[in-house]
A protein has these predicted regions:
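C-terminal active-site "lid" helix and adjoining low-complexity regulatory extension at the edge
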Residues: 77-96, 102, 106-111, 120-163
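Phosphate-binding site of ATP-dependent enzymes
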Residues: 1-69
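A short linear-motif detector with a strong N-terminal bias
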Residues: 1-3, 13-17, 35-36, 93-99, ...
Length: 163
């Protein structure tokens, strides 16, 4: 059995399960989304990993992809290997993706920062693939911007207190 991804997401590269990496941060005020990128596999690849030649593209708050994607060679790409312009793509049910990540973070509150790998299924609904509690990856900042944003001082203080 395997997950069938959304037609929209599959059109970007049908050979891999293309996933969203959503990074959330939990503090006393609640859960905040720090960054979101879409990871798209290299043409013919079965994985969407950046390290295996895939690309990633930042996602705007409305669910549309930013117009530029990045691969591990440092190339700036405006379309996928299937010819889809990144700026023309919108993630289905993007608001639900954020809601899902936020609600799941409360289940594991002992981790302050979590990276969620989420796919969009054939019914355009988010599905959790896995979550990562360390090594969030500095790479995604290339596409999404500074990871900690307005929380940088707060997060750095947590790091200082733990050492």
């Amino acid at each position: 059995e395997f997950l069938e991804q959304s037609d929209i997401i599959s059109s970007l590269n049908p050979s891999s399960l293309n996933t969203l990496r959503v990074v959330s941060y939990l503090n006393n005020e609640g859960v905040h989304i720090l960054a979101s990128v879409l990871r798209i596999g290299k043409f013919g690849s079965t994985t969407d990993n950046f390290s295996t030649g895939g690309l990633f593209c930042g996602i705007l708050e409305n669910g549309r992809l930013k117009g530029k994607g990045y691969n591990p060679n440092g190339d700036i790409l405006t379309k996928t290997s299937t010819g889809i312009l990144l700026e023309d793509c919108e993630i289905p049910n993007y608001k639900k993706v954020h809601e899902m990540a936020k609600s799941m973070h409360y289940i594991v509150p002992y981790f302050k920062i979590i990276s969620w790998d989420i796919a969009i299924n054939k019914n355009n609904m988010p599905v959790l693939i896995e979550y990562n509690t360390n090594k969030q990856g500095i790479d995604l900042q290339i596409a999404a911007g500074p990871l900690f944003g307005k929380f940088i001082d707060e997060i750095l203080e947590i790091g200082r207190e733990s050492h």
